[in-house]
């Protein structure tokens, strides 16, 4: 199941400010000259991409589409950053790929580009690829990349080297007897892998660390965090085990959804997680809040062994979540669970004393899923058909037709521009009885787990046999019509595909002994 990344759009309403250090005087001066300088961003394409990745030990690549508004906004900042970094030692190279160009689409597929702009850091000839998670303005890009190009883990030689560990952020430190051996090698490997997410350090002096103990049994990995236990240790140096330890330890046991900007990084991590999510929403400013909080935290401890992440949200700060899930304030206090299959379970007007029992019913599989859906339209006569959550599977997967479906938001400017184009394409194809162009308001309806909707508009093309492809083609009516005509299945092709699919289980099912 793909991550339900629409959840992340809930956080766009938050005032998430990615702060960056002020530009140095020489960088500011260089920025003033940027407009007159030659383009510093490399233009890559299918023919030169591999050579460029192999040539540059460190390169940031932007996958963009010419029609993408966010890409257009990023372009001048990206170019300015490239010029500011052009003389950096070691070299920091910025490049771009038009992922909408037909010949470059295999590159976009290879590197799992699912939205625009997508930025990825390529290190060591492409052996290490990471998502870029830094700011989107020039000075912020520069400072972030300078940090990324240095060592993945810094040695802590003296107490003053460790003062940064108390800055209220998450830090990971490896404590060793010597900087060699399997444990140290594995630690550095993980630091390189996760360097875009966390700061790593290493030392042979445990007493240099805050709350340190010179007698600590080494080697170990110590994670510093500004919540819960404040310090947690692990002695398992298997890379996979270490990664799981860091992931589990770097988010509060209960994430708080309020207006405090210090909580925003944890919210992003929470909503990006694949794990089931339990969310209690209520008014933080009313009297019962403390009793609910106490009961909820008690439930979290009781179910601590379960694979679920917990959140408590203030109604005032959580309006995006309410709108996304089709909830109303008069339903609060409420608990909402979204599981790994995108199914949702709702308990409205919950009482503090009911929280544990309701969660137990969820874990025991006794609850009925809740689905947000607009009513199925009584009349649906326009060229572009309106689809809702309650009938999307019937229209898209069970209609035996070729369906181009748009996931849109009513407030989205790009969606508004696309609407008349889809109308024109649908009108052109009205005589094609095996073709449907449809749309669904993804803010008013739950998006099925089969679709990965990261932004608006998102379009998918689904054939009668069930083949599902993210549409990344042109945005004119003619281009859409041409794409559908070239890629649609005939009744015969769909039947053949269905027959082949039906035969697969029999061909692959292992022989079983029957008693």
UniProtKB/Swiss-Prot annotation:
Region span, Disordered: 494-515
Where's the Thioredoxin domain? Answer: 26-150, 346-489
Single annotated GO MF: protein disulfide isomerase activity
Instruction: Name the site position(s) for Contributes to redox potential value.
Output: 69-70, 413-414
Which Pfam families does the UniProt record give?
Thioredoxin, Thioredoxin_6
Q: What is this protein called?
A: Protein disulfide-isomerase
Which segment of the chain is annotated as a signal peptide?
1-25
Output the CDD domains linked to this UniProt entry: PDI_a_family, PDI_a_PDI_a'_C, PDI_b'_family, PDI_b_family
Q: What is its main location?
A: endoplasmic reticulum
Q: Where is this motif: Prevents secretion from ER?
A: 512-515
Gene name per UniProt: PDI
Q: Which GO terms describe its biological process?
A: protein folding; response to endoplasmic reticulum stress
Catalyzes what? Catalyzes the rearrangement of -S-S- bonds in proteins
Which residue positions hold the site described Lowers pKa of C-terminal Cys of first active site? 136
Cite the active-site annotation. 68 (nucleophile), 71 (nucleophile), 412 (nucleophile), 415 (nucleophile)
Q: Where is this site: Lowers pKa of C-terminal Cys of second active site?
A: 475
Q: Which residues are glycosylated?
A: 283
| Family the UniProt entry places it in | Belongs to the protein disulfide isomerase family.
Keywords in alphabetical order, please: Disulfide bond, Endoplasmic reticulum, Glycoprotein, Isomerase, Redox-active center, Repeat, Signal
Task: Give the location in the cell.
Answer: Endoplasmic reticulum lumen
């Amino acid at each position: 199941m793909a991550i339900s990344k629409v959840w992340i759009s809930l956080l766009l309403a938050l005032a998430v400010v990615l702060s960056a250090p002020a530009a140095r005087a020489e960088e500011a001066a260089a920025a003033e000259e940027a407009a007159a300088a030659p383009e510093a961003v490399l233009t890559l394409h299918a023919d030169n991409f591999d050579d460029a990745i192999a040539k540059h030990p460190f390169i940031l690549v932007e996958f963009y589409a010419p029609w993408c508004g966010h890409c257009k906004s990023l372009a001048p900042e990206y170019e300015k950053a490239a010029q500011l970094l052009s003389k950096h030692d070691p070299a920091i190279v910025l490049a771009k790929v038009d992922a909408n160009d037909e010949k470059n689409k295999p590159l976009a597929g290879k590197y799992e580009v699912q939205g625009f702009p997508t930025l990825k850091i390529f290190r060591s000839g492409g052996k290490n690829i990471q998502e870029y998670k830094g700011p989107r303005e020039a000075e912020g890009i520069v400072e972030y990349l300078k940090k990324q190009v240095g060592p993945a883990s810094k040695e802590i030689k003296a107490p003053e080297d460790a003062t940064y560990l108390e800055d209220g952020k998450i830090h990971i430190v490896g404590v060793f007897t010597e900087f060699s051996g399997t444990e140290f090698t594995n630690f550095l490997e993980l630091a390189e892998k996760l360097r875009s997410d966390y700061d790593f350090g290493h030392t042979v002096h445990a007493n240099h660390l805050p709350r340190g103990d010179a007698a600590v049994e080494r080697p170990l990995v110590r994670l510093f965090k500004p919540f819960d236990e404040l310090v947690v240790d692990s002695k398992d140096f298997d890379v996979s085990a270490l990664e799981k330890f860091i992931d589990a330890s770097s988010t509060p046991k209960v994430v708080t959804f309020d207006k405090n900007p210090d909580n925003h990084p944890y919210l992003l991590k929470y909503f990006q997680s694949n794990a089931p999510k339990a969310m209690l929403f209520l008014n933080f400013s009313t009297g019962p809040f403390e009793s609910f909080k106490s009961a909820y935290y008690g439930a979290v401890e009781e179910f601590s062994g379960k694979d679920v992440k917990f959140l408590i949200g203030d109604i005032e700060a959580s309006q995006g979540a309410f709108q996304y899930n089709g909830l109303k304030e008069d339903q609060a206090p409420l608990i909402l669970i979204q599981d790994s299959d995108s199914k949702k379970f709702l308990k409205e007007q919950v009482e503090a004393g009911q929280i544990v029992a309701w969660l137990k019913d969820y874990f025991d599989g006794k609850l009925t899923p809740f689905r947000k859906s607009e009513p199925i339209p009584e009349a649906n006569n326009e060229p572009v058909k309106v689809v809702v959550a309650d009938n999307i599977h019937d229209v898209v997967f069970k209609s035996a037709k070729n369906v181009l479906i748009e996931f849109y938001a009513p407030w989205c400017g790009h969606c508004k521009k696309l609407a008349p184009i889809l109308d024109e394409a649908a009108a052109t194809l009205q005589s094609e009885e095996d073709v449907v162009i449809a749309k669904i308001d993804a803010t008013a309806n739950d998006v099925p787990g089969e679709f990965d909707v990261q932004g608006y508009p998102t379009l998918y093309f689904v054939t009668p046999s069930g083949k599902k492809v993210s549409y990344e083609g042109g945005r004119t009516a003619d281009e859409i019509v041409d794409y559908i005509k070239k890629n649609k299945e005939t009744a015969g092709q769909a039947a053949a595909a269905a027959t082949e699919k039906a035969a697969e289980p029999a061909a692959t099912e292992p022989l079983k002994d029957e008693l």
